[in-house]
Amino acid sequence: MTVSYTLKVAEARFGGFSGLLLRWRGSIYKLLYKEFLLFGALYAVLSITYRLLLTQEQRYVYAQVARYCNRSADLIPLSFVLGFYVTLVVNRWWSQYTSIPLPDQLMCVISASVHGVDQRGRLLRRTLIRYANLASVLVLRSVSTRVLKRFPTMEHVVDAGFMSQEERKKFESLKSDFNKYWVPCVWFTNLAAQARRDGRIRDDIALCLLLEELNKYRAKCSMLFHYDWISIPLVYTQVVTIAVYSFFALSLVGRQFVEPEAGAAKPQKLLKPGQEPAPALGDPDMYVPLTTLLQFFFYAGWLKVAEQIINPFGEDDDDFETNQLIDRNLQVSLLSVDEMYQNLPPAEKDQYWDEDQPQPPYTVATAAESLRPSFLGSTFNLRMSDDPEQSLQVEASPGSGRPAPAAQTPLLGRFLGVGAPSPAISLRNFGRVRGTPRPPHLLRFRAEEGGDPEAAARIEEESAESGDEALEP
């Protein structure tokens, strides 16, 4: 059964995730404790052997091997390999979940398209939705061990009511070397076409909509089957597994406490006459390697996460509840196309019939939310310039072929030492203000403000020419 803790993390609070660490079902402790105990036992055996059973010469050789293993373990890019692999597995896991076929859309279309309150109409609707559920049961039998244990043979499928004996005989008479989960979908299409000929489906548009929804449903069944068929390449899984196991095999030897290497002590101060040098100091003798055990817990746990969700249709604690999905889909779909068909509550005026702005009430616990202003956009409270000239509308002239003028920034020009824009700026490139004469002060770059005198003179000439053109009828 899927482990759900959504309610426990509904609010961010102190120690919110810490409370989840005490759970056992679906936890990393349940997945990893055997490997963790094995790693600790092997580490203890090697430590006891080094401390009690080896001679001084053998200890020296062992220390050399341990230092070599410790250096070699750091050469394995474990975080890089595991990160990519777990990301791939998690994306695949979620895609498999979204590929589980649900009949909700299809049952609504059946209820709206297949008409008739008599026994024939009821039979058509129930049979169509039963065929859809049968297709999902057949494909889930092929990919989920839980469903296969529930329906080990086709006789169990018949006894569960998803298929009749005649349908089973017809199904088994079809000879094919491939999985036949698609057969109920073909029965569905043939029965829908017959309902159209009989007038139960009133037009071709409704039939087309019904078949489109069926194809979406069948596509999910097919995708689920192909996810089970095409796995993540085995070589990738092998590389990741070998990398993790190799890292901790080297760590078993390399992380052991050994005597410090000669000359490894830090440089000491000058000794006084008669003072003996201090012995070489190494790492403290940790009988329990806490950091190594934590590293094993993180990396091996990371690999266990991928191992659990790489196939979510098994029987682990966090695998998909396929049997409950089958029960839910059958019950809901039959209810919608049979008992709920044309079974409507009376249409009545709603509570806010005469109100222009309906406002549902709040409880005391949520009343403060009603005082918050509604979100109108990130730029709603942006302060605009008080200068009215900045809000004047102008028309661009894309046919001019000349570059648009740059805005004059006197303050920036003082700091950067830049002059006025290029003399190639023409007043004809500026659009006219809609409904008003062109204000020359918007385009004039005066020489006394730090601009180019030659550019200012040219702008004055073009301003005069444009003014003459505006006066002509």
UniProtKB/Swiss-Prot annotation:
- Sites where the protein binds Ca(2+): 10, 308, 311, 316, 319
Among PANTHER family, the record links this protein to: BESTROPHIN, BESTROPHIN-4
Q: Which portions of the sequence form the region Disordered?
A: 379-408, 428-473
Please give the residue ranges for the topological domain Cytoplasmic.
1-31, 83-237, 304-473
**Gene Ontology MF terms in the entry:** bicarbonate channel activity; chloride channel activity; intracellularly calcium-gated chloride channel activity; metal ion binding
Q: What gene is it encoded by?
A: BEST4
User: Function of this protein?
Assistant: Ligand-gated anion channel that allows the movement of anions across cell membranes when activated by Calcium (Ca2+). Mediates the movement of hydrogencarbonate and chloride.
Composition skew (Low complexity), residue ranges: 396-407
Q: What is this protein called?
A: Bestrophin-4
Residues annotated as transmembrane: 32-51, 61-82, 238-255, 290-303
* Positions with biased composition (Basic and acidic residues): 445-461
Q: Where is the composition biased (Acidic residues)?
A: 462-473
As for subcellular location, the record says:
Cell membrane
Q: Which reaction does it catalyse?
A: chloride(in) = chloride(out); hydrogencarbonate(in) = hydrogencarbonate(out)
